[in-house]
Amino acid sequence: MQAITRRLVLGAALVASSFGVLAQNKVILGVAIPSADHGFTGGIVWWANEAKKELEKKYPDLKVIVKTAKDAGEQANQLQDLVTANKINALVIFPQESAALTKPVEQVHSKGVYVTVVDRGLTDDSGQDAYVAGDNTAFGRIPAEYIAKALGGKGDIVAMRGIATTLDNERMDAFTAVLKNYPDIHLLDAKYANWNRDDAFKTMQDYLTRFKHIDAVWAADDDMAVGVLKAIDQAKRTDIKLVFGGAGAKGMIKTLRDGTDPRIQANVSYSPKFIYDAIKMTAEARLKGEKLPPKSIVPSVLITKDNAKDFYFPDSPF
């Protein structure tokens, strides 16, 4: 991840503003992110505040204002406050929802604020200057390929979806595209569980009631995988041989590394640290009067027991 970050920051430094503007005297950078309502967003909040602390110490002409929101409505209101009360001239936003935040972000952008969107893309990208995200296509493709191979190309599976966002669509589209190559693998259902372990627990209970045989579960998130496993254990179902989460939460990676649950055989990387990278890249570019590349993607890779030690960070909040 450090090497990836260095490459992204170097790329940002090389992309000068097409308008040739001089460096700004003062950058007031607003950061709008979801509240820490599950493990991944907990990591997002932690890394955002780490960026604020480190960058404000390093750059006296930079002020970073971090706002967390419990839903799309609150986040939209915070954007108004950041513009009118805090007078921001740059924004890094991890949208609560894609569609609901597209217009509010466009309104901020129309006032001359430089906008970097992170992870959950907008439905219309004309209101942004840059986009930084993990590789959502690989995040969906890698689990599908692993599950298909593990099942020998045939079996019954169920899936979880997150929140209705562009990134969730990208992941699901990539997952189902792989399955088209395996006509004997049947995707029984794929419901939204909001990247939440309690919602995933309830969704999995529904699946277990409706489907008498399931070979594997694509939980699509490590928090949701925890809820899935709890539901399976409570139902005492032994038919499910594989539960594939995602994002590399330390608890799940430890289980994978130690081999303590045979259903946890693999994972896919997707670190919340990219919010730190996005804030750092945006702040440093704007202090120089420069722009970021229009799109920066952090690769996702397959994590197995063989390389799990490289993705296990015991001091991380996620």
What is the predicted function of each stretch?
Residues 3, 23-318:
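A residue-level marker of the well-folded mature domains of exported/periplasmic proteins
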Residues 6-10:
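N-terminal export leaders
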Residues 18-20:
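N-terminal signal peptide c-region/cleavage motif recognized by signal peptidases
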